[in-house]
Design a protein with these regions (language model features):
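Non-heme Fe(II)-dependent double-stranded beta-helix
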Residues: 2-38, 44-142, 146-149
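Short, glycine/small-residue-enriched coil/turn segments at secondary-structure junctions
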Residues: 151-154
Length: 154
């Protein structure tokens, strides 16, 4: 078995850190106010094109059917759709398998953004990867996650 990257609680390479400078205040006060009023924030550029391509490359490797037996995944479903002509890939544990997904959660610019929005230190709970191809993908039914994630404090 390959190395379980969850054993490392820091970035493992400069693939992300060197491309995005650390900033204590990534968001404007208007963006933070919008989040506090509406509960979401869209259109925040946190990754550059190279970082997105690294994630896409690692995603393609993760989605390879031979990965389905990798014990580092907490959950792995190549297709959760009831319709075999649709695609709904779903996996938990990508950060344990992929250096790009691992290093993403320790990206200083990303964690600084979370600190601003949460007004406190973020805590990584788990990762979840859904892939639903455009015009081809299945759907995830509307739901509220609070019934699943009932913790509001550590």
């Amino acid at each position: 078995m390959s190395m379980d990257l969850s054993q490392f609680h820091h970035q493992l390479s400069a693939r992300f850190a060197s491309k995005t400078a650390h900033a204590s205040d990534v968001l404007t006060s208007d963006q933070v106010s919008f989040f506090e009023e509406y509960g979401y924030l869209a259109g925040v550029d946190l990754l550059d094109d190279d970082q997105v391509e690294m994630l896409r490359g690692d995603l393609a490797a993760i989605m390879h059917p031979e990965m389905s037996g990798d014990p580092r995944f907490y959950e792995y479903n190549f297709n959760e759709s009831a319709d075999p002509s649709k695609v709904l890939f779903h996996a938990l544990g990508a950060w344990r398998v992929s250096r790009a997904f691992h290093d993403l959660i320790f990206l200083p610019r990303l964690t600084a953004c979370f600190r601003q929005l949460l007004r406190g230190q973020p805590r990584f709970w788990h990762d979840q990867v859904f892939v639903k191809p455009a015009k081809d993908g299945a759907v995830v039914a509307w739901h509220q996650d609070y019934s699943y994630w009932t913790r509001t404090v550590p």
